[in-house]
From Swiss-Prot:
<keyword id="KW-0411">Iron-sulfur</keyword>
<dbReference type="InterPro" id="IPR042096">
    <property type="entry name" value="Dihydro-acid_dehy_C"/>
</dbReference>
<protein>
    <recommendedName>
        <fullName>6-deoxy-6-sulfo-D-gluconate dehydratase</fullName>
        <ecNumber>4.2.1.162</ecNumber>
    </recommendedName>
</protein>
<dbReference type="InterPro" id="IPR052352">
    <property type="entry name" value="Sugar_Degrad_Dehydratases"/>
</dbReference>
<keyword id="KW-0408">Iron</keyword>
<comment type="similarity">
    <text>Belongs to the IlvD/Edd family.</text>
</comment>
<feature type="binding site">
    <location>
        <position position="200"/>
    </location>
    <ligand>
        <name>[4Fe-4S] cluster</name>
    </ligand>
</feature>
<dbReference type="InterPro" id="IPR020558">
    <property type="entry name" value="DiOHA_6PGluconate_deHydtase_CS"/>
</dbReference>
<feature type="binding site">
    <location>
        <position position="127"/>
    </location>
    <ligand>
        <name>[4Fe-4S] cluster</name>
    </ligand>
</feature>
<comment type="function">
    <text>Catalyzes the dehydration of 6-deoxy-6-sulfo-D-gluconate to 2-dehydro-3,6-dideoxy-6-sulfo-D-gluconate. Is involved in a degradation pathway of sulfoquinovose (SQ) that allows P.putida SQ1 to use SQ as the sole carbon and energy source for growth.</text>
</comment>
<dbReference type="GO" id="GO:0016836">
    <property type="term" value="F:hydro-lyase activity"/>
</dbReference>
<dbReference type="Pfam" id="PF24877">
    <property type="entry name" value="ILV_EDD_C"/>
</dbReference>
<dbReference type="InterPro" id="IPR000581">
    <property type="entry name" value="ILV_EDD_N"/>
</dbReference>
<dbReference type="GO" id="GO:0019752">
    <property type="term" value="P:carboxylic acid metabolic process"/>
</dbReference>
<dbReference type="GO" id="GO:0046872">
    <property type="term" value="F:metal ion binding"/>
</dbReference>
<comment type="subunit">
    <text>Homodimer.</text>
</comment>
<keyword id="KW-0456">Lyase</keyword>
Length: 579
């Protein structure tokens, strides 16, 4: 353990426990009420374990056990652990989308850490929105923290084929729609694709965000790829518990070490992974909580320099477990050293130049080099930024996952005002659609849905699937699962619900996309758009009460991170008075 910099009386929790007052008496009394001895908590760093465990969140179903491992580490290092449940925001089960609740998790995390006698925290999460939500809240409170990622699930296997969560779900669902997979095989696939605890085993949003957190310095170095079911995972969790006690004594709050260079390291890893487009939104939100300005232009500039190096689904052919045993994050970062700020020290105080010096790569096909990428910059990028009269504030596309023929495309729009209409009509044999048609879904953004669900990978109409078409140009103000693929333009800003031009496009308008030029336009004159705007009537549902109402009133647009306008970096909130 490093030399202590703080004295016991400087611990934040001492305000609750140390004074000879009636209020501090009550605090000490209540801990003894549950069977704790004074010597177990007095004069020790109080470590919160923010746990997103839930029986409705399969990705986090093991985090109750991991919390016990963290506690072992905290006790061993001389701290006092307390487990605090927070909402799980696990994908799949939560409707309409977990994105609706990311900011709520951030608020919950921040206020728990502020309102209780906490000196530092271990953040237990992993599924998509849990990582940014926990980090955003922790950054706003600014206590020493370590992120303990849930870890990816084991490789999927089905009839001799390696299968990845999300990626193959989409592929096989299209085959089932065509009658190529019967019910017996379909039900068999349910139990074969997701075989263990943990997050998606592809480069989805979960693995993208935990890897970014790792590269930025919030985890124990290299922790992000450890499989959830591996014995190394609880050992890592215990180490997190020991490490956070050390960080408290050293006062390693994020504000003392996190800089724009740390964010840039996270961005570089994001691009090299071929990561989820969702990370663009989350990274902007995380950076802004730390008072660091990050824009879509900066993300796109990094994507234009760093090709996709990970040979993992959906861009490649392997899975996260393979990546871990090929060397994991340290091996990947060593391959992109020219694009990193190696002097950056993370929460633990270790710099990347020392951590990468001896980082081995055991499989150069899974973790490629800059001169032998999985997807070259000429073939596509992790993130392409588009602007034009359809998206003046920007839209994004994962061009590395799109068909080459559609990266420069013109075609007539087929517009759907809501997801229900889309679902009802998409397989109608009479639907007027060709391989050149541009499918558009609107009112599916942050305000319009609300919560910006992952509806952006619009299904291919059945009549086109039957004709052999497997990709179409699709545009929406919603998001897409990081496990998916296809020519999908996402995060159109401003969204339709706040009056963005997407609200004005009509079926039959010609849409022009040029990924290389970074443009997305509709062939409609300014005068005609003005006429349409004058007669426009908003189509989205509005909420008068509940969290959805708060969300619609205060959420920012995709290019701004979809945070609440009152939660971004600003004046520090004072410590709570104790009376």
């Amino acid at each position: 353990m490093s030399e202590k910099h703080k004295k016991i009386e400087e611990l934040r929790s001492q305000r609750w426990f140390a004074p000879d007052t009636i209020r501090a008496f009550a605090h000490r009394q209540r801990l003894q009420q549950i069977g704790l001895r004074r010597e177990e908590f007095m004069g020790k760093p109080v470590i919160a374990i923010l746990n997103t465990w839930s029986e409705m969140s399969p990705c986090h179903s093991h985090l109750r056990d991991r919390a016990e491992a963290v506690k072992r580490g905290v006790w061993a290092a001389g701290g006092f652990p307390v487990e605090l449940p927070v909402q799980s925001v696990g994908e799949v089960m939560v409707k309409p989308t977990t994105m609706l609740y990311r900011n709520l998790l951030a608020m919950e995390a921040e206020e728990l850490l502020r309102s209780l006698p906490i000196d530092g925290a271990v953040l237990l999460g992993g599924c998509d929105k849990s990582t940014p939500g926990l980090l955003m809240g922790a950054l706003s409170m600014d206590l020493p923290v370590i992120y303990c990622p849930a870890g990816p699930m084991s490789n999927g296997q089905w009839r001799g084929v390696k299968t990845g969560a999300g990626t193959h779900t989409k592929k096989y669902w299209d085959e089932r729609r065509l009658g190529l997979i019967d019910t017996v095989a379909w039900e068999e696939l349910e139990g074969a694709m997701t075989r263990s605890i943990g997050t998606c085993n592809t480069v989805g949003t979960a693995s993208t965000m935990t890897s970014i957190a790792d590269a930025m310095g919030f985890t124990l170095p290299g922790a992000s790829s450890i499989p959830a079911a591996d014995g190394a995972h609880p050992r890592m969790a215990s180490q997190c518990g020991s490490a956070i006690v050390d960080l408290v004594w050293r006062d390693r709050r994020p504000s003392t070490w996190l800089t724009d260079k740390h964010v840039a390291n996270g961005v570089a890893v994001y691009m090299a992974m071929g990561g989820s487009t969702n990370a663009a939104i989350h990274l902007i939100a995380i950076a802004r909580r730390a008072g660091i300005d990050l824009t879509l232009d900066q993300l796109a500039a990094a994507a234009a320099k760093i090709p996709v190096l990970l040979n993992l689904f959906p861009s490649g052919t392997a899975l996260m477990e393979d990546y871990h045993f090929a060397g994991g994050l340290r091996a990947l970062m060593r391959k992109i050293e020219p694009h990193l700020h190696l002097e950056c020290e993370g929460a633990t105080g270790q710099s990347w130049d020392s951590l990468l010096a001896d980082a081995p790569c055991y499989d150069d096909d899974i973790i490629r080099s800059l001169d032998n990428p999985v997807v070259s910059l000429e073939q596509g990028a992790t993130l392409a930024l588009l602007r034009g009269n359809l998206c003046p504030d920007g839209a994004v596309m994962k061009s590395s996952a799109a068909e080459p023929r559609l990266r420069r495309h013109s075609g007539p729009a087929l517009v759907f005002d809501d997801h229900e209409t889309l679902s009802r009509m998409i397989d109608d044999p009479a639907l007027e659609v060709t391989a050149d048609t541009v499918l558009i879904l609107r009112n599916a953004g942050p305000v319009g849905a609300p919560g910006m669900p992952e509806w952006g990978n619009l299904p291919i109409p059945k009549r086109l699937l039957e004709a052999g078409v497997r990709d179409l140009l699709r545009i929406s103000d919603s998001r897409m699962s990081g496990t998916h693929y296809g020519s999908c333009v996402l995060h159109v800003a401003p969204e339709a619900a706040v009056g963005g031009p997407l609200a004005l496009v009509r079926t039959g308008d010609i849409i022009d996309l040029d990924v290389a030029a970074g443009t997305l336009n509709m062939r409609v004159s300014d005068d005609e758009l003005a006429r349409r705007r004058a007669g426009h009537v908003p189509q989205h549902k509005t909420y008068g009460r509940s969290f959805a109402a708060l969300y619609q009133q205060h959420v920012t647009q995709a290019n701004e991170g979809c945070d609440f306008d009152f939660l971004q970096a600003g004046e520090a909130v004072p410590e709570p008075p104790i009376h």
